[in-house]
Amino acid sequence: MSALVLSESLGTTVRQPLMRATGVSKSYGDTIGCLDVSFTLHPGEVIGVVGESGSGKSTLLNVLSAQLPPDAGTVEYDLRHRGMSDIFRLSEPDRRRLMRTDWGIVHQNPRDGLRMDVSAGGNVGERLMAIGARHYGEIRAEGLDWLAKVELDASRVDDKPKTFSGGMQQRLQIARNLVTRPRLIFMDEPTGGLDVSVQARLLDLLRGLVRELGIAAIVVTHDLAVVRLLADRLMVMRHGRVVEEGLTDQVLDDPHHPYTQLLVSSVLQV
Amino acid sequence: MNAVAKKASWDEAYNFAYLDEQTKRMIRRALLKAVAIPGYQVPFGGREMPLAYGWGTGGMQVTASVIGPSDTLKVIDQGADDTTNAVSIRRFFKRVAGVATTEATEEASVIQTRHRIPEKPLKEGQVLVYQVPQPEPLRKLEPRETETRKMHGYAEYGLMHVRLYEDISRFGHIATTYSYPVMVNGRYVMSPSPIPKFDNPKMENNKAIQLFGAGREKRIYAIPPYTRVKSLDFDDHPFEVQRWPQACALCGARNSYLDEVVLDDKGGRMFVCSDTHFCADRQEKGHRGPMAADPAARAFARSSETSEQKEDDGR
Ligand SMILES: Nc1ncnc2c1ncn2[C@@H]1O[C@H](COP(=O)(O)OP(=O)(O)O)[C@@H](O)[C@H]1O
Ligand SMILES: [Mg+2]
Ligand SMILES: [Zn+2]
């Protein structure tokens, strides 16, 4: 037991990256989406991506999560059996399998991430069934378990998400993604469009789950309060480029780039 | 039909079997591909066929493409040979292809069907043509064609079980009773067309060729003879066919698919075989159900013509 713990902690100190982006660029015609972005993400680490609207955060996230091929640059991921691999060189079925097992994607708009005509339990169970679960009782039990983890009432398990509030839909999306125990989860403005009190509760929940499960995450937001609470490290984007990066507290408390200073001061005014 | 000339036994105002040769060749190519890849939906360039609304043209086009002058055609609609649609389709092919027609399953070389598989086991050499309104079993949950195509391509079928999961969570059991999805040859999930799930087990290892035509969606698919066909289910909710506590009121069959028939406005009803030929055949062989002698029941029997014959023959 202690030997295992030791070797595991040794493994962590080696710091094998989970994902590595190198020179990632994506334009839409003449419009720059993101430009020459490079970074390394380690297992269990949470990176926040901040910047004003239009700074390229969603574009970057969509490329990293294999939803949008880049014009230039590579995105490598530590596949369970193959090690670091360029995700855009995987075959499409392999990439799709990765996206629904080892990754999770929480969309800003729950409509993009949930099946609105399928019950909450069915939404959570879908990934399990996709990887071969064929025991109804077990799938349902797991669904109920995850509803509890995201603080949704078990009595809602057979209700459709279209009857849920925005905050509940977002929590259901999280449960639906985490059920296969992914190692990496992508989130685009996870608290966007929610009331402030609902936002705070969702953030608490997310922080708890990410810490408890040791999941790595890339969280895109224009809201510095979100990354303050969730992110270990921060990347600040402007006009598609990363202008500053570092540990969250350092960047927020002692911003070096003038643009970051502006961002931080404007949030202080809010 | 009376005006048929000697050299051709069909109405020569039409090309044989109505469709032009090029169209039939195109459909046959699609059929060959479909047979080679069991359960895979092959797109084809569909044509219009003259028929009553509600029948769709997919099955008709397939039948027109496989039928030859020496074939014998049977047409069933919900198990019955004598509905308006079954009669008019039979008459149509008699006219445009000059083929013999029959109600007897064992005599037919081509059987066109909507909603049932005959009770009598099919033989090698027979062709069963299904009329299909919606070929895509995933469509209800995934409206995007690009996505369902990928799901089939990569055998990503989790969604199919989501559909069954939803059934159980709502009704306590898999409530889907027709169009019940099957896995063909361990590879493609397929809609069996709106047959009752009672008929699903008949598709497996069937000796006949099973061809499916969807006219509106322009898709053809097939199950070659002796192919594995498994109905999807859960370990703790295994697939089951419908069962009835009673036997057929007319022929006493206990292993056939029964339709409920209302006899009067006082709650009188009976359950009879949906396969009218199967039922009549059994009665002809002397099998009797509990209401076989009841005149009201006889009057309501679907295939009254055949039943009357039986009365004469049987006694
Ligand atoms: N699909 C698209 N087509 C054209 N331009 C786009 C598209 N998506 C984003 N853009 C543009 O790319 C830039 C970055 O957008 P985006 O990545 O959405 O930024 P953010 O998420 O930070 O608001 C913006 O100028 C935006 O207008
Ligand atoms: Mg965005
Ligand atoms: Zn009967």
Predicted regions and their residues:
Chain A
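Helix-to-loop junction immediately C-terminal to a conserved catalytic motif
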Residues: 65
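The feature captures the beta-strand-to-loop junction immediately N-terminal to the Walker
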Residues: 50-52
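Conserved ABC ATPase signature
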Residues: 160-164, 168
